[in-house]
Amino acid sequence: MNKRELGNSGEEKAVEFLKKMGYEILHRNFRCKLGEVDIIAKEGNTIVFVEVKTRRSLKFGYPSEAITMTKQRHLKRVAEYFVQRQKAKNCMYRFDVVEVYMNVKNEVLDINLIKNAF
């Protein structure tokens, strides 16, 4: 399984997890001229922009550590674009991170949700 397949599998598991946590999934892999966000969901009245990071080991650190300041800025721009496009300027929104840990058999070992990650 290559990195893209691992990432896609992790996103599938993250969507299942978020649904169980009561999130309503609005979009997956939302793309615009400013960038891309893995999942856009809604929890209550809050729009949640979710970045999913999937790992097989901690060899390169925790998954959330891979979300650099540059990536955070890109995600914030995409979020602002999305909110403006939806004409929901006064809505509340936040950024969550879902860390998915999988083994070589593509089985989930653990899923960690970080609300208000940045």
Curated annotation (Swiss-Prot):
One of its GO terms (molecular function) is nucleic acid binding. Pfam families: UPF0102 (PF02021). SUPFAM superfamilies: Restriction endonuclease-like. Transmembrane segments: none annotated. CDD domains: PoNe_Nuclease. InterPro entries: Restrct_endonuc-II-like, tRNA_endonuc-like_dom_sf, UPF0102_YraN-like. Belongs to the UPF0102 family. NCBIfam families: PRK12497.1-3 (NF009150), PRK12497.3-3 (NF009154), YraN family protein (TIGR00252). This is UPF0102 protein Csac_2148. It comes from Caldicellulosiruptor saccharolyticus (strain ATCC 43494 / DSM 8903 / Tp8T 6331).
